[in-house]
Amino acid sequence: MKKIIVMMSLLLLFVVSCGSSKEFSIDVDGKGKVPNFEIKDLNGKTIESGKILNNGKKTLFIVAAEWCPHCKEEMPEVQKFYDANKDKVNVVVVFTNNQSSLGKVQTYVKNNQYTFPIYYDESGAIARGFNVTGFPFNVKINNEKVEETLELPVDFDSLTASFAK
């Protein structure tokens, strides 16, 4: 019996370590510093977040779910904002694995023809790191710090006003 418990513990440890990304935590309300973390695009390419968040531009950072009605409402507005501001503002949309899959997200993005940068939170580490409790989750990041949590729902005009500050 003791051997079975040890084997099960080792198996659980192995599964958890293989499937998890490096964990982090950000004090979003306290406008915390955003640490560097790994993020995957929809093709499975791993990118260091610093390369997309710390390039001298403010960043609209969204954690969303393809099944979320409010996210579906916001995404066309985000696309419009991206088209008008892509040279001045980073737009980073991270779709969660919560009740979803990479395939579902890829299909959703393709069907809606979104062209802004899209990533997939395979392990849920990004949603946990930003302490996301609901979708969509929208923040403005500037100089590696959370500058503002954006009120929901966001639209083109509210995004334009927020990033004009």
Regions found by a protein language model. Name each.
Residues 49-72, 92:
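Short active-site neighborhood of thiol/selenol oxidoreductases, capturing the structured segment around
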Residues 14-17:
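C-terminal motif of bacterial Sec signal peptides marking the signal peptidase cleavage site
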Residues 1-4:
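Positively charged n-region of N-terminal signal peptides that target proteins for export
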Residues 110-114, 122-164:
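Thiol/disulfide oxidoreductase modules built on the thioredoxin-like
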Residues 19-51:
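N-terminal "domain-start" segment that seeds a small globular fold
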Residues 56-59, 87-90, 115-116, 143:
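Loop/turn elements at helix/coil->beta-strand transitions in domains of secreted/extracellular proteins
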Residues 72-111, 125-128:
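Structural microenvironment flanking redox-active thiols in thiol-disulfide oxidoreductases
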Residues 33, 57, 133-134:
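Short, small/polar residue-rich loop motifs at catalytic or cofactor-binding pockets
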